[in-house]
Amino acid sequence: MDGGVAAMVETKPKWLTYAEMASPLPRPQLPRNIHKSTERLVFCYQFYKVRPEWWQLADEEREEGKREFLDILHTFDRHLLIRPYSTLGLKSTTDFLLWLISKEMRGVELFTAALQHSFVGRYLDRPYTYLTLTRPSIYLRHSQRRLEGEAVEEHPEQEFTGDAPYFFLYPFTKTHEWYQLPYEQRREMMLEHFRIGNQFPTVKTYTSYSIGLDDYEFVVAFEAEDPNEFQECVMRLREAKARPYTLVDTPLFTCLKRTPEELVALVF
């Protein structure tokens, strides 16, 4: 092999190999409302923590690592939807979140492999990962329903925008008793849940399903304009009739929406 060609092969970033493997994957088109859409998408919420050793590197090494990290995000964004968020100073165990949205689990696998084989990847821990699938809710059958003498829209159109400055997320699991209740009884309680949520129109909810895939049954994520309004919404939901049937709903993460460039400037 020619020496120049050999040098080019040797200097090709290993992460680029995984990006090339991801090239056949179609970039997902998000439905207007995931709670009603029949299209199944893969959601993977990956939380990362930068190791202390990163800060012992020379400035030049860190700058090169930051450029490579951005290259990975922008390259894979052709095949996945990648939403970055900062948790810096908001959660002691994490520094940032990458919300990956893919049509196939292989997209998540290849992105993770690329990041692990990058320079920055040597200095990242991933303390939390939540894998879910989207699917239509079994409790949404009609566009409207009467509840307590009031016309209630079961779930308003909640378009994915990614523009809200605040993002909240937690996994949760229902009790065994919940699944033994008659369907109509469960549905009535969920309609009350929806009615309370609808009183906070700037708080958008995305519930996805991890049953059979991960340790929890669901992951619920919220986009919000104001953390005070989100907190008020959660406090009201604590009073709902379905609340006693929640077995666990921690850990909870508070995240701030950031562009890739903003995230890199903050955490690296």
What are these regions (language model features)?
Residues M1-A7:
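Short, Lys/Arg-enriched N-terminal segments with co-localized hydrophobic residues
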Residues G3, R187, R236-R238:
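Short, solvent-exposed amphipathic alpha-helical segments in soluble enzyme
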Residues V9-D77, K103-F111, Y130-Q199, I211, ...:
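Short S/T/G/P-rich N-terminal loop/turn motif that feeds into the first structured element of a domain
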Residues I72-T94, G121-P136, F194-V219, C233, ...:
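Short, glycine- and small/hydrophobic-rich beta-strand elements in well-ordered beta-sheets
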Residues G89-L90, G107, V120-R122, E159-T161:
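Short, charge-rich binding segments
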Residues G107-F111, H117, G121-Y128:
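Short, solvent-exposed secondary-structure capping/transition elements
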Residues L110-S118, E232-E239:
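Short amphipathic alpha-helices in soluble, non-transmembrane regions
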